[in-house]
């Protein structure tokens, strides 16, 4: 539901353009953006169900999500002069093989090898080198 990384001046912009208070803007950014803003749902299970049904907005939500996560992983890899492992935590990271399958392809340039079968079958799936 959260907005992700946004320019901090969005608070001022929404206040002036939409007449929103700071509290309204913070509520909007934290409860009405992110997955909900793209497809109307915040739960990954619902979003992947919609994707299976052919919903383009749900597919876009997860494509953007995967892209943003890959950007963060790349930035961390650069800041730390490489990576030893990529570890998925939290509700989506630990419980959604679909999300891991959307995120990991494209990270091979880091030397990572993703095992989609292990990701699907194992509760603590791994991306290993």
Question: What are the residue ranges of the model-derived segments?
Answer:
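Glycine-rich phosphate-binding loop of actin/hexokinase-like ATP-binding domains
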Residues: 1-16
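Glycine-rich beta-alpha junction loops
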Residues: 5, 32-33, 92
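Short gly/pro-enriched beta-turn/loop segments at secondary-structure junctions
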Residues: 6, 42, 81-83
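Buried hydrophobic packing segments
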Residues: 10-14, 47, 73, 103
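A mobile "lid/hinge" subdomain adjacent to the ATP/sugar-phosphate binding pocket shared
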Residues: 18-61
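Internal helix-turn-beta structural module
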Residues: 59-83, 93-129
